[in-house]
Swiss-Prot record:
Residues annotated as signal peptide: none
EC number(s) on file: 2.3.1.275
Bilayer-crossing regions: 4-24, 56-76, 80-100, 112-132, 138-158
Protein task: Catalyzes the transfer of an acyl group from acyl-phosphate (acyl-PO(4)) to glycerol-3-phosphate (G3P) to form lysophosphatidic acid (LPA). This enzyme utilizes acyl-phosphate as fatty acyl donor, but not acyl-CoA or acyl-ACP.
InterPro entries xrefs: G3P_acylTferase_PlsY
Entry keyword set: Cell inner membrane, Cell membrane, Lipid biosynthesis, Lipid metabolism, Membrane, Phospholipid biosynthesis, Phospholipid metabolism, Transferase, Transmembrane, Transmembrane helix
UniProt subunit comment: Probably interacts with PlsX.
One CC-aspect GO term: plasma membrane
Species the sequence originates in: Enterobacter sp. (strain 638)
Protein name: Glycerol-3-phosphate acyltransferase
Length: 203
């Protein structure tokens, strides 16, 4: 069934290119996340400018647009190598969306969704790693960075045949977080709790 894989890659890219952060903000009458807050059209920035409900909607949609193309290809019998490329295509679409002038998010939620069809055990470990990192540090970006660094080792342990494509995904996520890494190093990164407090503060 790898004959259909190139078409699935293209479809995954198109799915990834649907920027839920921009669409949710438009529907909810919120500022454009590309020019507000951190300027990143992702769930964390929507949390900053729009609150929890909008952020959850963005998060769920971003996970699904990574999960559904990979899960569909998996059910059609596509081989692990091509599944990895389909997952990468969904994340590339999220990061450089053709529908929104190639200005997208950082791909964390979409990458998580793309990895999820590999197995729920892996999904649980990955989610736990991100959550623990955020709870201990207060930085959403650090949770993403730590998860991206550890993900290839988790995959090697649970499903070694997917190690290479997941490693490629991790590299992509880390590259997209280079600004966050610099801010963390300089201790200039904003903690997620601070974002929530600013949102709740009276105007």
């Amino acid at each position: 069934m790898s004959a259909i894989a190139p078409g699935m890659i293209f479809l995954a890219y198109l799915c990834g290119s649907i920027s839920s952060a921009i669409l949710v903000c438009r529907i909810a009458g919120l500022p454009d996340p590309r020019v507000s807050g951190s300027g990143n059209p992702g769930a964390t920035n929507v949390l900053r400018i729009g609150g929890k409900r909008a952020a959850v909607a963005v998060l769920v949609f971003d996970v699904l647009k990574g999960m559904l193309p990979v899960w569909g290809a998996y059910m059609l019998g596509v081989t692990p190598f091509w599944l990895g490329l389909i997952a990468i295509a969904a994340c590339v679409g999220h990061i450089w969306p053709v529908f929104f002038h190639f200005k997208g998010g950082k791909g964390v939620a979409t990458a998580f969704g793309a990895i999820a069809p590999i197995g729920w055990d892996l999904t649980g470990v990955m989610a736990g790693t991100w959550l623990l990192s955020v709870l201990l540090s207060g930085y959403s970006s650090l949770g993403a960075i730590v998860s991206a660094l550890i993900a290839p080792f988790y995959v090697w342990w649970f499903k070694p045949q997917f190690t290479f494509p997941v490693s490629m995904l991790s590299c992509l996520i880390l590259l997209r977080h280079h600004d966050n890494i610099q801010r963390l190093w300089r201790r200039q990164e904003t903690k997620i709790w601070t974002k929530l407090k600013k949102k709740k503060a009276p105007k």
